[in-house]
């Protein structure tokens, strides 16, 4: 029994350098545009860390990709004058900050000596941290009024007592792009939310288009 335990630990320790060769971490940052029914997109941002594990090798073939991102989702809603003819326009601006965790599986294949193509897809989960909602009204005389509707929209409720903004989000995403010199990654992405992110809009599932860069160590 002792020999089996010793043999197990020897095999485990000897495999660590191989596993380390197939694993690496990096940093990433990017921009995104949040689109959904009844809202107008605004630009958001993301920053965080990521890791990769090559099932056989990080040079090519199948790999796993996971990131931990601080990400903002922003949009606006234009209400016009609501038919009251009291002002020229009225808008609501909302910015949310999430901690997002996408876990993808992808494939890497060489295009040239220094360039590789990357494609990956998988689920994500998000936790809403904080967010504000503000308004802007332009009156008929040209004067403008600005103010805050919700200081933290994740804790706010509507007139029926419903949460206005869901704190948790989940869905699936797709990424594709290139890697240069095994260090620099340039990616385009799309994420689709499977749950409603707001009670104010009927079909409020997230559609997030993104562009990002990463540096792998």
Where are these regions (language model features)?
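Sec-dependent N-terminal signal peptides
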Residues: 5-14
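Sec/Tat signal peptide C-region and signal peptidase I cleavage site
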Residues: 16-20
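Glycine- and aromatic-enriched membrane insertion/assembly motifs of diderm outer-membrane
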Residues: 24-26, 34-91, 97-99
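Transmembrane beta-strand segments that form the barrel wall of outer-membrane beta-barrel proteins
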Residues: 25-37, 41, 188-199, 203
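Extracellular loop and loop/strand-boundary signature of outer-membrane beta-barrel proteins
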Residues: 33-38, 86-92, 158-162, 196-200
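Outer-membrane beta-barrel transmembrane domain signature
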Residues: 55-57, 61, 74-76, 94-185, ...
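Flexible, surface-exposed loop regions and adjacent strand-edge segments
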Residues: 81-87, 135-143, 203-208
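Outer-membrane beta-barrel "beta-signal"
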Residues: 205-217
């Amino acid at each position: 029994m002792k020999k089996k335990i010793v043999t197990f630990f020897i095999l485990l320790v000897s495999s660590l350098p191989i596993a380390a060769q197939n694993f690496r971490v990096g940093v990433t940052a990017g921009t995104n545009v949040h689109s959904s029914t009844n809202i107008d997109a605004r630009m958001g941002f993301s920053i965080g860390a990521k890791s990769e594990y090559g099932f056989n090798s990080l040079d090519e073939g199948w790999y796993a990709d996971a990131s931990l991102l601080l990400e903002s989702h922003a949009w606006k809603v234009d209400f016009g004058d609501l038919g009251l003819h009291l002002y020229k326009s009225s808008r609501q601006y909302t910015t949310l900050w999430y901690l997002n965790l996408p876990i993808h599986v992808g494939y890497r294949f060489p295009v040239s000596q220094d360039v590789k193509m990357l494609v990956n897809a998988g689920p994500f989960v998000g936790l809403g941290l904080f967010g504000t909602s503000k308004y802007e009204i332009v009156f008929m005389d040209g004067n403008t009024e600005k103010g805050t509707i919700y200081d933290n929209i994740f804790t706010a409720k509507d007139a029926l007592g419903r949460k206005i903004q869901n704190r948790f989000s989940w869905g699936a995403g797709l990424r594709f792009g290139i890697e240069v010199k095994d260090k620099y990654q340039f990616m385009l992405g799309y994420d689709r939310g499977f749950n409603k992110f707001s009670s104010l809009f009927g079909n409020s599932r997230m559609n997030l288009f993104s562009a990002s860069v990463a540096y792998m160590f």
